[in-house]
């Protein structure tokens, strides 16, 4: 029986999908591989199911690099994530595939890029797109190979996946569903002044009298702990635990605020005029959103409270991660359990003149990604580019499962085996069709749908303040660029997708389109003069 491990292939440009790679094999080998596949899975002789490791996947919503293992904020206190990192491997150059919940999570769970599904906005749910309704998701892939699968909290966006699809006798996304993600306790009225864009109910932060046990994430962690404590041992399990915080509204109890006294609070590196060297296109991708601009936060004296609230929520959710880790460590299966922790995207706290996500800079794209468990080196870091897209093939490989030809990620197993091993393919993040950010170890290239671009030397400019392509029409004045800079642009450009699917049917919420006569936000043409910074 043939077993093809996609981890053994070279780092191809991103437009070379697994299917395209497979089609490049000799015909007899390709036909044999496809003939022995089931549900798009390339199968082979498999080890005894019971010997396979358990997987606990912990997802945290809107968590940027403000965690101790990444050092994004000098004050942050995340002892549980620090403990996990000390037990395993932290990818310090990991990036999401979309700076928005639904497309990012869809990409991770299906192994396909937004450009390959047309999922760019908060809708639709992938199963409602006829072309992709039968995609095998990550939990389903494990279920097909003998795993018990459980999902609690926010793994898919909103309530996606929880309802039985038409024609199904049962919900086929996983075996067991836990509680949905929720804010939990809320104050009787908003704690901050009315915000622009309709005073959205989620735009709020601060503390009010309530208990940690009243929060939605506490309930999700309690469910996860109960599942681990009572887990049968007849088969391995794949447990997905998704936490809501630090997504807005950023509410936490007073004890978490006490960790960050206002008088000693370190503010993020916010540079006045930081958007002076970025094109108008950089504004279009977050054109009209409920998240306040930095100017509003400063005028209403809300920037410091937001930063403090975000940090407090990060520390609270870290404590819930700690509860799950404690349950794993006291479990009789602790030595055979792999833990992976990730966030769907980052979050701006005033940097680049905005709060929220929906950008292609480090604040939105860089995410925590930590692996720990059997076969994973302890206390190590890897600065090679990594993508959330890579989790599907990586976890499959670590569990001894065969690959799935639908996936476009590349396994991180070579870097887990050797954290210094070079990885040719950079990380790409997409926000609506045509807008991409591409990162390797040194450079970040951003190209917008109208061809306008930005380039940052992340080695000398880690906060991405200095756009090296300022006032340089893209490739029309190549001679103005240094040789090294031009070569970096050339190298990264080859990873732009050759084709991009248009918006999937039912797409809505935070949708930007480039049409012949300009950019359109939510079907309304953008007028540059309307820019509010």
Task: Walk through the language-model features, giving the residues of each.
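N-terminal secretory signal peptides that target proteins for export/translocation
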Residues: 1-20
């Amino acid at each position: 029986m043939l077993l093809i491990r996609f981890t053994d292939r070279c780092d191809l440009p991103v437009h070379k999908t697994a299917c395209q790679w497979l089609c490049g094999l000799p015909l007899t080998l390709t036909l044999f591989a496809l003939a022995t596949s089931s549900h798009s899975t390339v199968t082979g002789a498999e080890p005894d199911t019971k010997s396979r490791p358990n997987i606990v996947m912990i997802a945290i919503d809107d968590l940027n690099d403000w965690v101790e293992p990444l050092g994004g904020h000098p004050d942050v206190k995340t002892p549980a994530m620090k403990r996990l990192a000390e037990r395993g491997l932290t990818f310090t150059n990991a990036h999401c595939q979309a700076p928005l919940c639904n497309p990012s999570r869809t990409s991770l769970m299906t192994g396909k890029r937004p450009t390959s599904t047309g999922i760019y906005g908060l809708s639709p749910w992938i199963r409602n797109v006829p072309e992709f309704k039968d995609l095998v998701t990550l939990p389903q892939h494990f279920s097909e190979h003998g795993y018990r699968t459980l999902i609690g909290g926010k793994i898919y966006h909103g309530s996606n996946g929880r309802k039985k699809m038409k024609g199904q006798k049962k919900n086929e996304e996983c075996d067991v569903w836990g509680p949905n993600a929720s804010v939990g306790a809320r104050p009787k009225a908003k704690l901050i002044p009315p915000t622009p864009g309709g005073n959205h109910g989620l735009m709020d932060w601060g503390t009010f009298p309530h208990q940690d046990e009243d929060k939605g994430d506490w309930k999700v962690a309690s469910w996860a702990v109960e599942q681990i404590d009572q887990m049968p041992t007849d088969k391995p399990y794949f447990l997905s635990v998704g936490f809501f915080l630090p997504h807005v509204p950023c509410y936490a109890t007073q004890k978490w605020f006490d960790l960050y006294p206002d008088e000693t609070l370190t503010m993020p590196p916010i540079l006045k005029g930081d958007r002076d060297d970025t094109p108008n296109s950089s504004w279009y991708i977050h054109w009209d959103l409920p998240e306040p601009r930095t100017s509003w936060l400063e005028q209403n004296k809300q920037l410091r409270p937001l930063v403090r609230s975000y940090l407090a929520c990060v520390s609270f959710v870290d404590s819930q991660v700690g509860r799950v880790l404690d349950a794993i460590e006291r479990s009789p299966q602790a030595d055979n359990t792999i833990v992976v922790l990730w966030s769907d995207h980052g979050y701006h706290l005033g940097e680049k003149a905005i709060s929220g996500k929906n950008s292609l800079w480090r604040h939105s794209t860089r995410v925590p990604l930590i692996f720990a468990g059997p076969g994973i080196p302890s206390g190590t870091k890897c600065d090679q580019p990594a993508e959330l897209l890579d989790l599907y093939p990586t976890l499959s490989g670590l569990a001894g499962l065969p690959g799935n030809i639908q996936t476009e990620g590349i396994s991180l197993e070579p870097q887990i085996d050797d954290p210094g091993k070079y990885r040719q393919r950079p990380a790409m993040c997409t926000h609506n069709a045509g807008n991409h950010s591409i990162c390797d170890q040194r450079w970040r290239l951003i190209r917008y749908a109208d061809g306008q671009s930005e380039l940052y030397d992340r080695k000398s400019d880690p906060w991405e303040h200095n756009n090296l392509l300022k006032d340089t029409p893209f490739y029309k004045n190549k001679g103005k660029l240094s040789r090294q800079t031009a070569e970096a642009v050339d190298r990264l450009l080859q990873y732009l997708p050759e084709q991009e699917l248009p918006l999937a049917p039912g797409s809505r919420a935070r949708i930007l389109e480039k049409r012949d006569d300009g950019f359109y936000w939510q079907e309304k043409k953008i007028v540059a003069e309307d820019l509010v910074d």
